[in-house]
Amino acid sequence: MAVKIRLKRMGAKKKPFYRIVVADSRSPRDGRFIETIGTYNPVAEPAEIKIDEELALKWLQNGAKPSDTRSLLSKQGLLEKFHNLKYGK
């Protein structure tokens, strides 16, 4: 089972709100997911990003691949922390 960290679209028309979820890569964008690890609101000024660092790092260590969320994770500094954990720096 290939697991991905991706965005699940919520909200109304023209007012998107996203949940950052861990899901099987075969399930649809807004379908089944394993766990919610954060939220992303692009409508707010500035855009609001809330991610549970412990959960995100846990899933990255277990092999979850980030999709479009890579830029959101790097803005929060999570990819750098994961890299340091993985390579022991």
Curated annotation (Swiss-Prot):
Keyword rRNA-binding assigned: no
Record's keyword terms, sorted: Ribonucleoprotein, Ribosomal protein
GO cellular component, as recorded: cytoplasm; small ribosomal subunit
GO molecular function: structural constituent of ribosome
Ribosomal protein in keyword set: yes
PROSITE patterns according to UniProt: RIBOSOMAL_S16 (PS00732)
Single GO BP term: translation
Annotated InterPro entries: Ribosomal_bS16, Ribosomal_bS16_CS, Ribosomal_bS16_dom_sf
Family matches, as SUPFAM superfamilies: Ribosomal protein S16
Entry-linked HAMAP family: Ribosomal_bS16 (MF_00385)
Similarity section: Belongs to the bacterial ribosomal protein bS16 family.
Name this polypeptide is given: Small ribosomal subunit protein bS16
Organism: Geobacillus stearothermophilus
Designated gene of the protein: rpsP
